[in-house]
């Protein structure tokens, strides 16, 4: 709906809008006419929203009133639904007014029958006299309906009705029963009805109207659960049925099913016959509620009423995150989470119980007291279950540890409005003796049994992950099966015993049985694997004892393999395991030995020598696999540390070898088997798939997928989320770059040719073209980039090449989305770089790389390469048989015609802009193989990961040329070294500064003003009026359902409470600010708006050009001035402290997208007088953090234009930029006219209103200054495509841009001169969005034609320029004595500092600000009115009492 609304709002033509409204009205009218029958009433906004949730529309212009309109509407709607179900033949209606047939749209010609019985006195007036009967008569129609009465009748009524009315087949009935009453909850639909509880019953009050209330007993609620009713024919009197068997008694059944349900109103269908009905009946539940466990004794001191789960989670996280959760803090947090309007729904006693419960949770330790399954050796793991069992028994006998208490205490019971249907069986129970409807209380024993149910906390103590259970543990479990079964104590028959049973004994008994069941199940499933591992252990021990040395014929363990970390070792086999016999019998041939065979004495000697070499190789059993990928592997190689390089590492033996799925081409299966890459079934992580699908659906990632319709994204995520699990056969192939991972597969594909159901998914288009060249005899659509594969579909066999470069979660999403996939083949290198997501708001950004997920399904890592020569490969820890020496050189010059590798994507773009199209990043060059590469080294290189560096260094086959672009060492670099990115975008040439400002000579000292005296004022005289109207904290705070109340009103001090304290960490205020200050759009709409307002931008620029006296011809570009401005910007940035530079590291990073913006909430105290003590807190201000290089570039552009602006600026125009109050005072005294009214101007949403027209103005201004075109275009790009985590921003100004102040000021000047006809010589002062003029100019006639096309709206304030009424500018008053701080604002700000106890820290600043007014002494009586004088006096007294600061005014002490 949001996108549809956005499209409609984009229409600006009034004729188009009129047509849309006319068409919408034609569509709306019949719909509203349809709903008018059931809902003709005027509804409250809240009730209308609830009704819309039930699919019932409300006419907003309806004026018909009703005491309980919403409840009556639902009643009417159910009658309408019933009318669509009833047959067009006579129906018997019971307890129904005949006029309500209108709501059913019944044909009045149908001879319907009415049976109404007066049960209550008011029924006499309710039903027409002719429909009232003394008792219910026989129903002679097939269908009947009972209206809102069945729940009051005895359950036997239905039996008697069907028994006495043989023709009746279907009975419809409406019930009014709020299911939440079963839990004694407040109404879940308070806008429709409310509930009150009295003893054993409750009252249903529709619309809070007591006249329409119903009283129910709790037993009535049983009616909502009935599913079937069975009874017998009466025989031999009341108890005659006892003499018959089940077969001898005639049985009758009716089936009850819920037809429709709205709030507390339900429509049931009761049909004669034994039919199917759902086992569980679910009613609408708008919110999720939970009940805390009953952990305190006596039980009365536990929370008994359901509480919103969100509230419970918020409170729980609060008490666990604060250092000390005091009682008052928890009460305050609860108060913060509850709206003031909802306080009457809570009981004070329940809140006390809740706070006590939360205090209990806060005092418990959250660190587990149980041992893990990862630590320790074989013996420790074997005894782990025994220790756990002992620990459990100890806790059962001696009491739970804190951690166990905490887990038990937060095991909240969900309050679910789903009920298991019941069968009421009257066959062998007399109807008159039916007593099954009174709810019974649980006994203590039953309650404790439920408390210690099998599905509780102890599951997490006794259940151990399958992958963490080792051989000895399972074998011990097998041996102890019989003992465990025999040791289980049988239950003692209960008989008639009702005495209290010790719950601890029941608890222990359940744990014992549970442990034995799980041990038996684990052991049975793993018996075969355990026996094999045990045999392997025994055999290895025997061989070690006999040989006394490591057996080189066995596969080395992970600990011996180079490049295997501790985590990897932990995920593979823990002991040595014998290799299959077929590997030991593998034959060996070596074509490289041909020359030696000619010299050797004979063939037998050659075989003996060869076999001797083979026998000494640690990887002799892996030779067939190495030979299959082209390696002889007869040489032992070592890395630079002297460690042996194993060509096969990271072996995983416990993977099952499975058959290839049906339809797998024989050539492909043969090649994979030769490499020992048989498939194994992998369960996919659907959470990763859902994260990827969510990002695609919400267009946070991708390029092609962003162009797809929203329905496709919904279908993608819906299909993924609908899967409970997804398993697929997979062959995972890991190997070093150039090891031949893809070669064997490409060979098989060439053999297969066309016609196969195979798809190859590639991470880049370059890799796709490479595969197309190497496998030319296949269909071109076999090779797809990953986004094309997701959109266009795949075959049943999918090959993912270089899958580490695919987005995390993509493989899981594709396989889950395409259910036809039955085999996947993954080729990649876990040592090389992985996919990096740059979108900050993408969910997959937080997922681990795919190689970490699938590495455990890879049988081995092929640590050998055909690409690099032996010397380079060995330095990288890789096995290689290529002879020769890799040429390595280094200089500061580039080689022509050689691919260039750079560390950052930004540098890649820059180099490609210079014509070097074969430039790649270190990470992006994966898959590239070239004879020569040149690698650029700069300050980003040192922050690249080892995986990325390995990727870059392994690209070349013959030569690597390093290019050092860094400068030589110097003391200057120490500060630049503070972050890894700073040097990459700062120029380090000698700065050529502009001419520095030379201050004017000091004016002669004026004659001092005569001193004066002002009367003592009441300390609270200024702020008292604001405090009188001060509301309660939570009435003023902004409330969000997601984050609770904001926290802007702080402390108990009423002075501090007047000021809104906006903090960056306030989530509620942040989102309120985002909603109020930021608008999202898309790049296309922004650019369209930019083009559509070109003519307005021209008008703005022409007015600005005339106002600022710019020459008519463009100003020639000055490279010298530009460089000087750039160095000024750079010097100002580097003048920051080293700590501040380090804090900006993220924005300095070349990986920070130049169009990305980080948005923060500005932390500040709001001291504006007009916002003191507002009844509702206003949204704050945002700060935007741009890419630092972008800020400095456009900051240079703004400073460059400022330099020329100041050169041409008229003297009557003053811009308060890099000036002092003394400068502004001198200018005002020289140029300001105080004899006429003046105008001060402010704006509504100034930043957000700077739309495409203002951008067009800025572009024209930049072009007039001859700014280079590429810089202007970059500025347009970032303004039309500024991206935050919510999407692309509309064209607007953001605090934090490089040219923010200058651009705001110049837009202000342009708008002011476009709107007003300002006489020549008028004094004007500007600074950002503030401005003031010394006259009140007329509005131009031409502006009325532009007003509606400009979003910017001004708020002019006219002052008379007399005592107490002077123009205000940036907090300064412009007076005939010069500028001075507004005394009221200064005093208000001072009182805040005093109330916070921070006056000593800022006293110097306040004294300086005060001095501009204080210097005028007696003249202040001519400038300030009474209130201003009061504020000025109180400020002076406060500063005197607090003591003088370092910049104190000595004359202040003589003032009073």
Swiss-Prot record:
Keywords: ATP-binding, Helicase, Hydrolase, Multifunctional enzyme, Nucleotide-binding, Nucleotidyltransferase, RNA-directed RNA polymerase, Transferase, Viral RNA replication. Residues 59-225 form the Alphavirus-like MT domain. Residues 512-528 have a biased composition (Basic residues). The keyword DNA damage does not apply. It comes from the Viruses. It catalyses: RNA(n) + a ribonucleoside 5'-triphosphate = RNA(n+1) + diphosphate; ATP + H2O = ADP + phosphate + H(+). One of its GO terms (biological process) is mRNA modification. GO terms for molecular function: ATP binding; ATP hydrolysis activity; mRNA methyltransferase activity; RNA binding; RNA helicase activity; RNA-directed RNA polymerase activity. RNA replication. The central part of this protein possibly functions as an ATP-binding helicase. This is RNA replication protein. It comes from Potato virus X (strain HB) (PVX).
